Amino acid sequence: MSRPRRRGRDIHGVLLLDKPQGMSSNDVLQKVKRIYNANRAGHTGALDPLATGMLPICLGEATKFSQYLLDSDKRYRVIARLGQRTDTSDADGQIVQERPVTFSAGQLASALETFRGDIEQIPSMYSALKYQGKKLYEYARLGIEVPREARPITVYELLFIRHEGNELELEVHCSKGTYIRTIIDDLGEKLGCGAHVIYLRRLTVSKYPVERMVTLEHLQALAAQAEQQGVPAAQLLDPLLMPMDSPASDYPVVNLPLTSSVYFKNGNPVRTSGAPLNGLVRVTEGEDGKFIGMGEIDDEGRVAPRRLVVEHPA
């Protein structure tokens, strides 16, 4: 007879984790979920095991709004090893080609310029995108290459930091769906020498403050401190969380009076003054502006519910 599944606590918010190198995004997600004893958790766009940096982890009801972070732009610092191409486009892969590094400063500047702005990118075979129901990296591990369509991305900023020997350091501000490994691999081919990522750090996601990032070690230390002091771990851990609606912070706010919000929370569109003409909105209620979900302005100018916060009993 199987034991009943243990239910975690109803904690809602977003933790800005500084992901360590060498761990998968799912591994750190599970560790954070256990530390917080959360009933639900999800991340908002995986980082490769080699990569470090900002990984927003949504807990509880915040998982409903994680999609808005998946759609947001991001900034990275990357160091490439020139002269070597790998099968994964990073240092975790096998070297498949070595060539001399002979380009000039002018050739580098010209090559970098081709990656700025709106461009098309063919994703790496070593990615989590799916083809006929299977992830691309599953095919790649079997030595199978499948067709991939080029996808539109935007590189808002591509900053040259340094070029020393066979290392090239860049900073990239880009749209959703951008693979930094692929940019480096494509750049290496354009320069005629090959390249792969040896260091990758995600600096920012959307408008989240960098100073609110915390490490796994810090979380574990706080949990241990709470146990030593005989206080609930939540007392030390929960203040680290960003609000559950922070993934949707770019959307305008519509505040409903309590007389209208009850209908909205029951799934009905409502009319209210001050709403935009169209698009998605963050919906709050009452004088304290409590977040109750995401809405969308319908054809009649009403605020129609799209994703609602489920209120759990205390």
From Swiss-Prot:
Query: Sorted alphabetically, which NCBIfam families does this protein's record hold?
Result: TruB
Any idea which positions bind substrate?
43, 76, 179, 200
| Reaction equation(s) it catalyzes | uridine(55) in tRNA = pseudouridine(55) in tRNA
Name used for this protein in its record: tRNA pseudouridine synthase B
Its domain of life reads Bacteria
Native organism is Salmonella arizonae (strain ATCC BAA-731 / CDC346-86 / RSK2980)
A Gene Ontology molecular function term for this protein is: RNA binding
InterPro entries recorded for this chain? PsdUridine_synth_cat_dom_sf, PsdUridine_synth_N, PUA-like_sf, PUA_sf, tRNA_psdUridine_synth_TruB, tRNA_sdUridine_synth_fam1_C, TruB_C
Say which enzyme class the record assigns: isomerase
List GO BP terms, alphabetically.
Answer: mRNA pseudouridine synthesis; tRNA pseudouridine synthesis
What this chain does, per the entry, is described as: Responsible for synthesis of pseudouridine from uracil-55 in the psi GC loop of transfer RNAs.
| Regions crossing the membrane | none
CDD domains from the entry?
A: PseudoU_synth_EcTruB, PUA_TruB_bacterial
Alphabetized, the UniProt keywords read: Isomerase, tRNA processing
PANTHER family for this protein = PSEUDOURIDYLATE SYNTHASE TRUB1, TRNA-PSEUDOURIDINE SYNTHASE
